[in-house]
Amino acid sequence: MSEISTALSLENCPCQSSHHYADCCGKFHLRQAFPETAEQLMRSRYTAYVLKNIPYIVVTTVPSQQTLLKPRLLQEWADNTTWLGLEILKTESLTKTQSAVEFKAIFQGEECEQAHQERSIFVKIEDRWYFVDPTVSLPTMKQPCVCGSGKKFKHCCGGFL
């Protein structure tokens, strides 16, 4: 948490919202508030990677996937990546409880700057937004959805991944 303590003095939040870190992603990282939109969650997760706050990455992943994550590997990745910027390209409300955020994250590669572009899916469960991680095992289309809606995966989040 020392990275967070240091970041609280940052004038500009790493998510590039143009807000002070303490008034932006900092309040989410310290669990003083929860993101109200999928975009806020996306920005706070990016900032968590910048600050190497892996516990936040885990708890903001949909609960049914949290035990499938490998925090040690996430930490290694964060330690070996220098993030340079975030650009939100598009935010879509898919349903009342599902949204997509397309973004581009700029990072320093071995020899030059590189960009990672992705369309991420977020789901709202009990008034909190979570990231649906497509890199871990997902249920088959006929199994219950990862979001806990009670619907089959193919009729819920599976249709967006």
UniProtKB/Swiss-Prot annotation:
Signal sequence range: none
Pfam annotation, one family: YchJ_M-like
Protein family per UniProt: Belongs to the UPF0225 family.
Name this protein carries in UniProt: UPF0225 protein HI_0277
Taxonomic source organism: Haemophilus influenzae (strain ATCC 51907 / DSM 11121 / KW20 / Rd)
Lineage: Bacteria, Pseudomonadati, Pseudomonadota, Gammaproteobacteria, Pasteurellales
